[in-house]
Curated annotation (Swiss-Prot):
GO molecular-function term, one example from the UniProt record: biphenyl-2,3-diol 1,2-dioxygenase activity
Binding locations of Fe cation: H146, H210, E260
Gene expressing this chain: bphC
Keywords for this protein: Aromatic hydrocarbons catabolism, Dioxygenase, Iron, Metal-binding, Oxidoreductase, Repeat
Ranges annotated as spanning the membrane: none
Catalytic activity: biphenyl-2,3-diol + O2 = 2-hydroxy-6-oxo-6-phenylhexa-2,4-dienoate + H(+)
Region of interest called Disordered, as start-end residue ranges on this chain: 283-303
GO biological process: xenobiotic catabolic process
Name of the protein: Biphenyl-2,3-diol 1,2-dioxygenase
Pathway: Xenobiotic degradation; biphenyl degradation; 2-hydroxy-2,4-pentadienoate and benzoate from biphenyl: step 3/4
Organismal lineage: Bacteria, Pseudomonadati, Pseudomonadota, Gammaproteobacteria, Pseudomonadales
Domain VOC: 5-119, 143-264
Cross-referenced InterPro entries: DiOHbiphenyl_dOase, Glyas_Bleomycin-R_OHBP_Dase, Glyas_Fos-R_dOase_dom, VOC, Xdiol_ring_cleave_dOase_1/2
Length: 303
């Protein structure tokens, strides 16, 4: 009766058209129509996984976590209330917008709107047709992917996501931010995906550092790298992470939030033990962020 996966994310952005082009033509997502939930995008048999709404924050607006059924939803609502968290039951209008049977809404300790739901819409009768050459995305029991939450107090956030929401610690990377500055990054799982959430006290203005999509082949990563690189949006070169062993690159979205696009992450099972890493990558992942930021700012200049 616990959270099974990250089911969907919604972004509030100042340039919806730029996001539409980026998600479909660069990353290979499928357009799934425009509703009062925003512009919707698919990566699998679900009716939608990412929503993009008009807004000025240029950031993650909400995230939805999936439970198995109504009993699981009620259990999570009770657990949140017992922890002193304000919980609202989503009305029929919100459930229709999200395409789910039932949901609750609340916020994490630092104000990120979160939802827990069950009964998401499946559209097997409408085959997934990628917007660019992608053989497929890895979802299923592992869910949509992950995001890295930026918070001022990682201990407080970690306690909330583990003690209240039930995530489990996979490992920790001590990120060296400068000669005398190290920030621990906590990687959490709720299924066999190595991490569905990471938490770090990064001094960034956004709610998240990046979100991640995992694809089916190394060629999917390579072709997407070339498409994104053609517009100068790469923020980190190809590399392989020390903790989940994913081969990936990072790129800037039109809002400045980054996306990680990767392949072949290892999974956690009952034999998994928590470890600590001193470096985020075995090789690669060299920063070229300044170049990408210049390209993003150029795109945002009025014509």
């Amino acid at each position: 009766m616990s959270i099974r996966s990250l089911g969907y994310m919604g972004f509030a952005v100042s340039d919806v058209a730029a996001w539409r082009s980026f998600l479909t033509q660069k990353l290979g997502l499928m357009e799934a129509g425009t509703t009062d939930n925003g512009d919707l995008f698919r990566i699998d048999s679900r009716a939608w996984r990412i929503a993009v709404q008009q807004g000025e924050v240029d950031d993650l607006a909400f995230a939805g976590y999936e439970v198995a059924d109504a009993a699981g939803l009620a259990q999570m609502a009770d657990k949140l209330k017992q922890a002193g968290i304000a919980v609202t039951t989503g009305d029929a209008s919100l459930a229709r917008r999200r395409g789910v049977t039932g949901l609750i809404t609340f916020a994490d300790p630092f104000g990120l709107p979160l939802e827990i739901y069950y009964g998401a819409s499946e559209v097997f009768e409408k085959p997934f047709l990628p917007g660019a050459a992608v053989s497929g995305f890895l979802t299923g029991e592992q869910g949509l992917g992950h995001f890295v939450r930026c918070v001022p107090d990682s201990d407080k956030a970690l306690a909330f996501y583990t003690d209240v929401l039930g995530f489990q610690l996979s490992d920790v990377i001590d990120m060296k931010m400068g000669p005398d500055v190290t920030v621990p990054v906590y990687f959490l799982h709720c299924n066999e995906r190595h991490h569905t959430l990471a938490i770090a006290a990064f001094p960034l203005p956004k709610r998240i550092h990046h979100f991640m999509l995992e694809v089916a082949s190394l060629d999917d990563v390579g072709f997407a790298f070339d498409r994104v690189d053609a517009d100068g949006l790469i923020t980190s070169t190809l590399g392989r992470h020390t903790n989940d062993h994913m081969v990936s690159f990072y790129a800037s979205t039109p809002s400045g939030v980054e996306v990680e696009y990767g392949w072949s992450a290892r999974t956690v099972d009952r034999s998994w033990v928590v470890v600590r890493h001193d470096s985020p990558s075995m090789w690669g992942h060299k920063s070229v962020r300044d170049k990408a930021l210049r390209a993003t700012k150029h795109e945002q200049q009025p014509e």
